[in-house]
Amino acid sequence: KGNYFNLNQKIYNKNKDFKDFQFIIIAPDGTQDEVKEILKGLNDLTNVSKWLFVFAPENEIQEYYNTLHLKGKLNSDFGTSNVYIVDKKRNLRGRKDKAEYKEGYDASSPSDLYNEMTDDVKVILAEYRLALKRNNAKRQI
């Protein structure tokens, strides 16, 4: 639950008003009641309309995780404390250069979320705004 609180405070609340921003959490089948409790707690803090949960069998979660080609592994509950930025085209976003390689952000670390994920979310949202401006300019011509 602490990880969801960290995400909510450091990332979600700052970006929830952007049309294209949402959280999608993939969770194992059978955790629906636990998720309801998490959402109930978050609902006291924020509008949870952009917190979306997808429930799937454990093997499908593992298969999806494998398609991302991540260095880390899922734990025995088919989860991880890491969160990832996936863009509209379903590309994994992060920091790719060797000096500061980062494919995910540790949700149990408020400083990781605040110092790094915040900046990386700003970058992708700026890209979306720029693309929208370009498209609108082309329509006016």
What are these language model-derived features?
Residues 57, 63-78:
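Surface-exposed short loop/turn segments
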